[in-house]
Amino acid sequence: MLDLFHGFNWDLGNIEKCRKHGVSTDEVESLFESDDLRIEPDIANSKIEKRFNAIGKTAKGRSVFLVFTIRNHENEILIRPISARFMHKKEIDYYGKENSRI
């Protein structure tokens, strides 16, 4: 999945939003290396820019829910994380029925 993008667009704002929920930048980035990554458009929250929801496991094996957008910065396509949090047990159970690896 990462081969479609040039990297990530981090700043203090989105780093802090992820840290607030205990998720590091390394964990967010490792989601995109996961074989079980699921990405869906977030239509309800895409009024200003297209947003996406992603779920998957980090390199540490922790299930994470991520909201992100795609940015074009200096002719590079970047993933811009907006917020990330660990998935609740109910979410893991729900998505686990569809994808047993999450």
Task: For every predicted segment, state its role.
Residues 1-102:
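Ribonuclease/tRNase effector modules and their secretory precursors
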